[in-house]
Amino acid sequence: MEIKAPSTQHATCVDIKGSGVLIVGDSGSGKSGLAIGLIALGASLVADDQCEILIENDKLHVSKPKSLPECIEMRGIGLVSVSTVSRTQLKWVVDMDRVAEERMPEFKFTDISGYRVPTIFAKNMDDLAFRIYVVACNELSEF
């Protein structure tokens, strides 16, 4: 997957202790659901459904378009106000449309205007919010 910056993307983003996690996928793939799980664990919402990706000081950042409310859509409930931050430094991409085929996969990356962002293929992954939260708070190890 390749994304250009600056741009507005159909995605959801949360901040976990200073690490921005951009959640991408088709409509109905579970982007907002994952974000809700991460918020329940302590993450803050950056933006739901649309995210502005920009380069500032040679780093990728994500912010909420000014036209969007500071809330998240909960299917079957409606729009709910949650804890938000105005922007975050992008550290991870979670791809809700792609399956991690291997138990211990090689590192995957998403190219965003020449920046390689570590990417987790998350379709059909159990306990997804817990896994993403732990990864965002720590580092992956290469053996």
Predicted regions and their residues:
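Short active-site oxyanion
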Residues: 41-43, 116-117
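Short, acidic/polar N-cap/turn motifs at the starts of alpha helices
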Residues: 11-13, 50, 107
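A contiguous binding-surface segment within folded domains or other stable secondary-structure elements
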Residues: 32, 54-58, 133
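Short solvent-exposed loop/turn micro-motifs enriched in small/polar/acidic residues
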Residues: 5-7, 46, 102-103
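Glycine-rich phosphate-binding P-loop
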Residues: 17-39
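Extreme N-terminal, non-catalytic leader segments
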Residues: 1-19, 24, 56, 134-138, ...
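Conserved nucleotide-sensing/catalytic segment adjacent to the nucleotide-binding pocket
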Residues: 44-98
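Conserved NTP phosphate-binding and transfer environment spanning the P-loop NTPase/kinase superfamily
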Residues: 86-143
